[in-house]
Regions:
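Active-site cavity-forming subdomains of large catalytic enzyme subunits
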Residues: 1-28
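Active-site loops and adjacent core secondary-structure elements that bind or stabilize anionic groups
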Residues: 31-169
Length: 169
């Protein structure tokens, strides 16, 4: 049963260390190691700002973990109504060239699990923007609905063209 795989101890230790971040440097991701090692070598200790940032990262990690558990549990006892609370744990995949407008920052996030859109490879052109990702998601959804042998053309998240041929040969 899946419930046996829910971690209690590790998450509790992470939360306790994050709560005590004024006195504890908590690393929850190997990607954090180089910056902390550099700071320790340079200053002999981590700064309060670093510890606070790492604590925020830790609480984001535990919230994402809890959101995944909540999502799983909801599938085990579906209800007809909409939930009062719906936690969504998102994991950053990449920064995008810009947000919805060129003066805005943006990033692509995914939920826990696989998504074909996040594993795609850009074959040609610039780094994608937020709007480019919306176009890709719109095209993917339309082609998925039309089925094999279909194509979609999307501009600013609006379908400009779509075609389907049952036999592509």
């Amino acid at each position: 049963e899946m419930i046996e795989y829910i971690d209690i101890g590790g998450i509790t230790l992470i939360r306790a260390a994050a709560k005590n971040h004024r006195h504890v440097t908590l690393l929850t991701d190997p990607a954090q190691y180089p910056a902390v090692i550099d700071e320790l070598k340079r200053d002999g200790a981590t700064t309060g700002a670093t510890r606070t940032r790492l604590a925020a990262d830790a609480f984001a990690l535990t919230a994402t973990y809890d959101a995944a558990i909540s999502r799983f549990m909801r599938t085990q006892a579906p209800s007809e109504g909409l939930p009062e609370r719906l936690p969504i744990g998102l994991i950053k995949v990449t920064d995008v060239r810009y947000g919805e407008n060129p003066h805005q920052r943006g990033a692509l996030y995914r939920t826990i699990g696989d998504s074909p859109l996040v594993s795609m490879t850009v074959l040609q052109g610039k780094e994608l923007s937020f709007n480019n990702y919306l176009d890709v998601m719109g095209a993917f959804a339309l082609v998925r609905d039309l089925g094999a042998g279909s194509i979609a053309i999307i501009k600013h998240n609006n379908p400009c063209g779509a075609a389907w041929q049952g036999d592509v040969l």
